[in-house]
């Protein structure tokens, strides 16, 4: 297991008395904004992402256990980005080979440029009070757009929509257009698995070829889940340096 002591963002979510477990959902007052999606107010909504992609070394995987499920909704979804890559045209595979993508740590949807539901609107503090957590200011990180699994050699599409910034070396308009296309392609239901939780369910996944999302649940409901991060990293990235990447 990867110790939370090694990562500020994980350490801030640690389960009391544990250095290995984090609590990814809570009861009571949320620690992040809630959102209206299709007119329904939902807490706990976390957009599609790859864990620790905001660091140079992407973790091997994670293990998630549902301690107390909510009464309605609260599903978690996964997308197999190796399957996404396999579905690309040969022309697209050739085009994106060698491209690098800049990622940023985001814990809210502020600044997310691609793929958010059209109906999404952030609820105000008056509509859905929350206690904001302190987010560390970390440098952006660069990873390949085509990721290669360190054990199998299989390629996957390195798309983590929550933290995407741009593609290095491309004009902004071209970068935005390509990322918008690739995010829309990735978020097709045919690539998704949506899990309907029961208490004590456990799901493990290979983080090096997946992205996942918490689909939210009604504001005011309780949902508690614990996660352990699996050690064994994919050292595919580096910190972004503006002058070096100009």
Tell what function each PLM region has.
Residues 1-204, 208-246:
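Fe(II)/2-oxoglutarate oxygenase catalytic core
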